[in-house]
Amino acid sequence: MHIHILGICGTFMGGAAILARQLGHKVTGSDANVYPPMSTLLESQGIEIIEGFDPSQLNPAPDLVVIGNAMSRGNPCVEYVLNHNLRYTSGPQWLQEFLLHERWVLAVSGTHGKTTTSSMLAWILEDCGYQPGFLVGGVLGNFGVSARLGESMFFVVEADEYDSAFFDKRSKFVHYHPRTLIMNNLEFDHADIFDDLEAIKRQFHHLVRTVPGNGRILAPKQDAALTDVLSRGCWSDQEFSGQDGEWQAVKLSKDGSHFEVWLQGEQVGTVQWDLVGDHNVDNALMAIAAARHVGVTPDLACEALGRFINTKRRLELKGEINGVAVYDDFAHHPTAIELTLAGLRNKVGDKKIIAVLEPRSATMKRGVHKETLAASLKQADEVFLYQPESIAWSVQDVAAQCQQPAFTSDNIDQFVANIAQRAEAGTQILVMSNGGFEGIHGKLLTALENSTR
């Protein structure tokens, strides 16, 4: 079958393309911006990529067009597909029909921690000999790829609540039909498609409805929003983590790099790893619990996590120059920002932390979280806020609310120079954005190298 993918360079669609190729299909695709690393990865799989959306790419017609959720009416290829009655579907629907319907699906959902927890779970299964397939929104550190078919019935998928396509406004995850479902947490996000938290809760309950009676749902006991979702009806076995839950963690180190795992009042394992932060301890509990549902004992899961390499862009050290460390993190929501900073603070103690933030997500651009942003940055000693052209509100408003020194700029080169000037030996620079941030990491490392300080 010839499958053509519109919007192929997105993380999800790129992963779907790799899976389609591994299934033996001829795969082509197009996108507005074709660039490495995704373009290189796809081409290495024998996938032809076309830049732009000239409808001529659809002649002769492929057997199926998979339309990414970034595509909308008015796109030349979309209009051609509709006008010529070509067979089309969404990415999540394709995944279900061509792959997931034959698998034991382990889905990881929630506002935060999906990619990291999915990666942990995939690695636990791999390390314990289960050879799972997976599709995750990031490059898995232990695998070097974001998707693979796997050699067993088990398939780990990052279950996103974002909409499926312009013609299917349901959340992606309602297509996945998991037997094992992790719901990590739930807060308001994606203000571009959801009006309020209640709208997201409805989608999460649609997801709960798809889990079979012999399935299992895993969630934190103290998350009020998820408690509300489950109270609307649940027909599957449930296990909970945290206070009053079956699964608990006892930290043996302040930064979360060493902790015990307890199940129903009994210690069942110990994790010692390179990750830090209470949020990662919580993620680990969920991954261990999900792996247990398919047969992995907690002690083996804990041992596997000791060999876990985190996904790129999760407190990833990009380099260290003259004693100044530069980290990259995907955090783009106040809760994630606060947790990431807390993890770094516990790791480095009293060392100076400079938080560098680009408010780039669709929700951030609308200013939805700007009132809580300053408080989320409280663990930083200094704050640098970038003013992208694409947002209508001023980051100066957030800077004014910060208790620590806070600086703003709309010029990336001046911004980098100012950060480098404030750094000294021992400083930890944490860059947070869900985009490329105009290559700031490389620019910072260059500026630090050129610095005489």
Identify the residue ranges that each predicted region occupies:
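Short, polar loop motifs at secondary-structure junctions
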Residues: A32-Y35, F53-P55, M71-S72, K221-A225, ...
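Beta-strand->loop->alpha-helix junctions that form or flank phosphate-binding loops
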Residues: I50-F53, G91-Q96, F134-G138, G233-K254, ...
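C-terminal accessory "lid"/substrate-recognition subdomains
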Residues: E260, H279-N280
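ATP-dependent carboxylate-amine ligase
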Residues: M1-V34, E43-I49, A61, V65, ...
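General beta-strand structural signal in soluble alpha/beta enzymes
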Residues: T28-D31, I50-E51, Y88-G91, V108, ...
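Generic structural signal for helix capping and beta-alpha/helix-loop junctions
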Residues: P37, N59, F98, N142-F143, ...
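Acidic-glycine-rich active-site phosphate/pyrophosphate-binding loop
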Residues: K251-G269
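Phosphate-binding loop of NTP-binding sites
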Residues: L19-Q22, E43, Q57-P60, N69, ...
